[in-house]
């Protein structure tokens, strides 16, 4: 069981690192907490915050479904922060350093910190429509390739998590993780659970010692704690072995264990379904319209550099609505999928009043700022568009 879990952890951690540093992907759009952060702006404006995408909603739904089925198994098997934190503790344990076990009441008190923390994060995120705490986020520091929007404090927080993980088992996951605060109400009603056969149990307490979330497994008949990761460490630690004194499965399955393969299959199914849905139903994360839609329209599908976030998408719409010699008359609708690389943009326009060439000029030509009395260069470059015949790798080539 434990070996299978470590293989899954290694697989998802490798996938995350390779996706970010090898394939230069935008891992932020696959963060389930991003779906929580983006919800208010998407409902009220139809747009998403920063470089988040509709895929954040799909993966959030997938994680919620797996939480209702398996409790917080996402945290125990898939989350890179949880995996790194747990492996750090396992590494120092092999050196003979035992983790500090806090008194139960103190541990439970500290675990309440994540609820006001998530409330503060969501309040300011919803109020400003920006990821105001992104620069302090240890997970973003890991998956961002250390971009310019990472602050010194992100490394301080990350260092604190690393240092804490050497002393206490998974401290961030237990006490501070905002996603854990979101998942806990769903995990409370999780279908599967750990069950202890009270009649056969010898009360050795090894199951509780093995639990990374400090759940007193040896004192309950069924583990209903929302913080359970379904990691099955308690099941593995039971000296009774396969007799089923400590078992995992649906309610009432005392003395019988479900195969761990079922748990992993549910995790992979929920994840694969969420990823497939994001590609089958690729809704834009930014949409804005000017004017009334005519009877006939044309569409330009472009790949644009420096269209990395919601703010850049608003700036792109500003260029499309310019009122100088490159003005585009009539109807305009911009749908965008912001991305740190070459982002996709779909621009719908009135073909009787302009054409695709005019759209491209409006996006890339300098803009005269009448109030400032100066020309402003466009920050955007369109992949494959080189009006001056100058070959610039970044401006004309999709990375």
Give residue ranges: language-model regions.
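Short linker/helix segments within small regulatory modules
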Residues: 219-228
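Non-ligating segments of multi-cofactor redox enzymes
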Residues: 1-210, 217-218, 236-306, 310-398
């Amino acid at each position: 069981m434990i070996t299978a879990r470590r293989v899954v952890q290694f697989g998802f951690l490798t996938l995350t690192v390779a996706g970010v540093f090898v394939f230069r992907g935008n891992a932020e759009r696959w963060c389930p907490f991003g779906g929580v952060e983006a919800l208010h702006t998407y409902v009220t404006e139809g747009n998403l915050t920063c470089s988040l995408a509709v895929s954040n909603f799909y993966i959030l739904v997938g994680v919620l479904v797996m939480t209702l089925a398996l409790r917080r198994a996402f945290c125990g098997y898939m989350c890179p922060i949880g995996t790194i934190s747990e492996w750090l503790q396992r590494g120092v344990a092999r050196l003979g350093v035992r983790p500090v076990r806090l008194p139960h009441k103190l541990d439970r008190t500290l675990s309440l910190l994540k609820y006001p923390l998530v409330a503060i994060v969501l309040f300011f995120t919803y109020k400003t429509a920006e990821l105001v705490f992104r620069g302090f986020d240890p997970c973003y520091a890991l998956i961002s390739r250390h971009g310019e929007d990472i602050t010194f404090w992100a490394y301080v927080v990350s260092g604190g998590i690393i240092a804490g993980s050497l002393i206490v088992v998974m401290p961030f996951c237990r006490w501070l993780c905002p996603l854990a605060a979101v998942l806990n109400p769903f995990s409370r009603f999780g279908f599967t659970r750990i069950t202890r056969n009270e009649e056969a149990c010898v009360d050795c307490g090894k199951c509780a010692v093995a639990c990374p979330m400090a759940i007193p497994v040896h004192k309950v008949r069924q583990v209903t704690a929302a913080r359970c990761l379904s990691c099955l460490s308690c099941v593995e630690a039971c000296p009774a072995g396969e007799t089923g004194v400590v078992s995992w499965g649906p309610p009432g399955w005392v003395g019988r264990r479900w195969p761990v393969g079922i748990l992993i299959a549910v995790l992979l199914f929920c994840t694969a379904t969420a990823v497939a849905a994001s590609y089958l139903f690729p809704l834009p994360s930014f949409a804005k319209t000017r004017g009334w839609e005519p009877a006939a329209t044309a569409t330009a599908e472009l790949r644009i550099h420096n269209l990395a976030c919601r703010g850049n998408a608003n700036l792109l719409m500003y260029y499309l609505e310019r009122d100088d010699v490159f003005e585009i008359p009539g109807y305009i609708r911009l749908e965008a999928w912001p991305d740190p690389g070459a982002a996709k943009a779909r621009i719908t326009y009135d073909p009787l009043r302009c054409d695709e060439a005019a759209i491209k000029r409006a996006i890339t030509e300098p803009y005269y700022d009448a109030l400032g009395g100066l020309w402003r260069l466009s920050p955007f470059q369109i992949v494959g568009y080189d009006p001056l015949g100058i070959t610039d790798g970044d401006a004309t080539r999709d990375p």
